[in-house]
Amino acid sequence: MTHATGAAAGGSVGAPPLPAHPDPQLDAILDGALPHELSYALGGPFHLLLPERFDANAAAFEGVLREAGVEGRVYYAKKANKAAVWMDHCALSGRGVDVAAAGELRDALGHGVRGEHLVVTGPAKAGDLLRVAVLQGCLIAVDALDELENVLAQARTAARPARVLLRRLPPAQPHSRFGLGGGELKTALARCAQARDAVVVEGFSFHLSGYDPSLRASAAGELVELCLKARAMGHRADRISIGGGFAVDYTDAGHWEAFLREQRPDHYHAGRSFDPADFYPYHSPVAGAAALRAVLAADGLAGRLREAGVQLLLEPGRALLDRAGCTVFRVQGVKDRDGYGIVTVDGSSLSLSEQWFDSEYLPDPVLLPRHEPHGEPYAACVGGATCLESDMVSWRKVRFPTRPAAGDLLVYPNTAGYQMDSNESPFHELPLPPKVVLDIAGGTTRWRLDRPPLA
């Protein structure tokens, strides 16, 4: 396996390298024959999934809760990746799932996830979503007063009380479109008190952008106080949800800082420019379960939760998928430009979703040559196989150790979280990349295609 590095063709040095953290276990698989065999068999790009990593990440979050003596539950944010295998593992382990649409809810239930292990989020939920959520005993995050009335109507029709969290508009982000303001929250609590036959207020939640543990802890502390006030009104109010917002650490600090310091428009195809604020923070010193530990430590939150008897609910997506998958494209052709090349692969940037948020997925792709590599280092951007100028998988002129050739493979690392399928589309009637589940237990590697239930 050959990582991006070195000087490049035509005197261009390419963009500063940004290698993903080493992953010896996955590297051993990529160094073997399997990626090329799968490329031949599937006839196009594909995603590799490692569900054992998903389980380990979830267990790490649960371990932090136990370490802090805090009761809680981890819900996987389903929107982060549509693969069926994550639902299978949540169902078997009894972990929760965060859904925000009727299709997501049906899919989770179809895989055996229990209704009481589902939390339903998102704004202005459709009636069919609320109906099934109430019938199945899901926990519903109520985002608005009119939505609360819809929930009450569904509950009375079903003759079953709805389980709800009231979503708070965070004071630190007053312009968010999510949540109930202070006055609306008081109205909602009073309305729920009048409708005890149709609703159980189990607690509160919020939607908070960003990755600052102290900001999340502060918002969580306010929810604990809201629980105490709600109990005085006769509500159950024994849990809060702090959502996701747990960063993933893709690369080390040195490479990340050098990249931000040195990157400039001539490092990108067509002189494309990116402001550092456009990028996801690909290095985070406090990431994943460690970020939860930081949240619990800030403002004495863990102690406040224990003292108040309040459970902590989490809805991580990307953080549960850290190192749980990668994306593989086959090189279809290479052309030379002034000082760099343009590699065209057999898929599109619709399968690497960061590009469609006016940004760039930055961890270096890894070149898997079909034949023994030789030649000089080579800088190239990577384009998709569509007729769109904007279809760039990598605008950046990546430093490859040798000139890619048709039939070689490019592996984009750590793409399971939000990259694989958030914006996938069969544009040009190109097939959607299949997801290949790897079983690496017991020292052998077996694979199967990811499939929905009953397929």
Report residues per predicted region.
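A charged N-terminal "starter" segment
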Residues: 1-142, 148-162, 196, 232, ...
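Flexible, glycine/proline-enriched loop segments at strand-loop-helix junctions
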Residues: 45, 136-142, 172-182, 209-217
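C-terminal active-site-proximal or functional interface alpha/beta core segments in diverse enzymes
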Residues: 209-213, 218-455
